[in-house]
Amino acid sequence: MRPDPDAFDGGTASRRLFGLYPALVKDIVDPDATGRIKVAFPWLGEAGNDVTAWARLVSLYADDDQGWMILPEVDSEVIVGFEAGAIERPYIVGAVWNGKEALPQSAEAANNKRLLKTRSGTLLEFDDSEGAAKVTLQMQSGHKLVLDDAAQSVTLKHSNGCELVMNTAGQVKITANSTVEITASAVNVHAPIVKCDGIVQCTTLITQSVVSASYTPGAGNVW
């Protein structure tokens, strides 16, 4: 049942509205900086665009200088309820897809995935598939972070193909398309052996001993 439009006449509280009602977001910048959202009521007909109210947004968490802050987009559809039915005290209790705005991902019967996707295409996805749980953080550009329980790996990947992988064997693999640079006051490597496929070049080499199958004479090459 639709509420009586006259309940909003003059903004008075002469009538009360119980239940939940659809509304359209018109403004998200509260002039009082209290987090309210300005909404209009399309079920009032053409007059609904002119009848607006500043509604408090129900959040998962709200406290002093902290909380869960995700505001709805202007012109998106939300659901509004009224405190004790008082029309001058509206609350936004949630947002809905209405057929015009599509879901970020089609629903599946297994219902394994939970996700948050933003306007720019940034995606945070939790996959609860049995034995293959996975968390993925991905940018539309292709940058990606994957925590994969099935593969027992953590992968950080740049859109250009550079990659850092930590796997279940305890290996850390770095793949770069160009150089890998380390800048620090000191770098300590603790390992019984360090292998290099190419040339090792340094300004100064201090060593306890050298074992080599060949020797190239040159400045500083004094044994």
What are these model-predicted stretches?
Residues 32-40:
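Short aromatic-glycine-enriched beta-strand elements
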Residues 17-31:
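Structural detector for short beta-strands of small beta-barrel domains
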Residues 40-45, 51-55, 75-79:
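Catalytic cores of peptidoglycan-degrading enzymes
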Residues 2-4, 10, 22, 69-76, ...:
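Right-handed beta-helix
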Residues 48-68:
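Beta-strand/loop nucleic-acid-binding surfaces
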Residues 40-42, 58-60, 119-120:
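A structural micro-motif recognizing beta-strand termini
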Residues 8-14, 60-65:
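Asp/Glu-centered strand-loop micro-motifs enriched in Gly/Pro and often flanked by an aromatic residue
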